[in-house]
């Protein structure tokens, strides 16, 4: 049996996020399968797959093609596009899924992806440009990783050591400035920024719900405590009153 050396195992665990998890693996397989179908359709001159399943704001607005908010996430604009997205999903998604659990991870992935699509639609309701790619969800994952492991070190371009929180701030700032400047034609920077904003609201919303739940639980315990004290006080006063009456002779 072939075994990896400890150094290789450590690199695999800490640099690449450890063994691939079930949901991350499934997402990568589905994305690659859809991309193969997409380029096969293009080879046969079928371009309607992008027009029908990509996010086309004007079609959502006037034809109510609401499924596009989900399906656009599985289409990509080229090998580099899908490679970067899937590599990022692999590197950062595994650890988040192990930490959160499958259900929360998958919910977060789709909520940030759909939220990014909605943001793109809102700023260009009557635009006929086709928006495709999982980048909104991927940027959401990067934000979540930065908030969960802010002081982890990553190597930017495999060379420059950088804390995750600074990497997320740089990428978020770049997406924000690009969305204002309208630079990089063909890149949906609003979707990138939208994925991060929706991800932040999702994570903070969970914090607020947890605090509200804790507050309610504390308030309920205090109410029960006061009710018990009142009941116990009544019982004690009754016992003291009965004792003052003296013994009952049968």
Feature-to-residue mapping (PLM):
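Generic transmembrane alpha-helix signature in multi-pass membrane proteins
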Residues: 142-143, 155-156, 171
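Membrane-interface micro-motifs in multi-pass membrane enzymes
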Residues: 129-150, 164, 191
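Alpha-helical transmembrane bundle and helix-membrane interface signal
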Residues: 98, 148-161, 208-213
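Cytoplasmic-side transmembrane-helix entry/capping segments in multi-pass membrane proteins
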Residues: 103-111, 132-137, 158-168
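Small-residue faces within membrane-embedded alpha-helices
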Residues: 113-117, 140, 144, 161
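Alpha-helical membrane-embedding segments
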Residues: 79-93, 166-176, 225-234, 238
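C-terminal transmembrane module of polytopic alpha-helical membrane proteins
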Residues: 1-20, 175-250
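N-terminal TM1-TM2 helical hairpin plus the immediately adjacent luminal interfacial "cap"
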Residues: 14-132, 177-203
């Amino acid at each position: 049996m072939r075994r990896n050396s400890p150094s290789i195992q450590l690199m695999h665990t800490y640099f690449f996020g450890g063994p691939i998890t079930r949901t991350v693996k499934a997402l990568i397989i589905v994305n690659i399968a859809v991309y193969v179908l997409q380029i096969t359709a293009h080879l046969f001159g079928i371009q309607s797959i992008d027009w029908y399943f990509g996010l086309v704001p004007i079609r959502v607005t006037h034809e109510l093609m609401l499924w596009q908010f989900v399906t656009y996430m599985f289409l990509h604009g080229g090998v580099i596009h899908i490679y970067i997205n899937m590599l990022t999903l692999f590197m950062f998604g595994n650890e988040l899924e192990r930490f959160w659990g499958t259900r929360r991870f998958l919910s977060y992935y789709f909520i940030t992806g759909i939220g990014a699509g909605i943001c793109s639609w809102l700023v260009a309701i009557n635009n006929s440009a086709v928006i495709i790619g999982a980048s909104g969800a991927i940027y959401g994952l990067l934000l979540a990783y930065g908030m969960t492991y802010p002081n982890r070190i990553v190597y930017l371009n495999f060379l420059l050591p950088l804390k995750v929180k600074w990497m997320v701030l740089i990428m978020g700032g770049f997406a924000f400035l690009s969305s204002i400047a309208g630079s990089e034609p063909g890149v949906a920077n609003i979707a990138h920024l939208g994925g991060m904003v929706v991800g932040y609201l999702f994570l903070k919303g969970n914090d607020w719900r947890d605090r509200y739940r804790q507050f309610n639980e504390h308030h309920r315990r205090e109410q029960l405590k006061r009710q018990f004290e009142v009941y116990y006080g009544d019982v004690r006063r009754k016992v003291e009153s009965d004792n003052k009456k003296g013994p009952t002779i049968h």
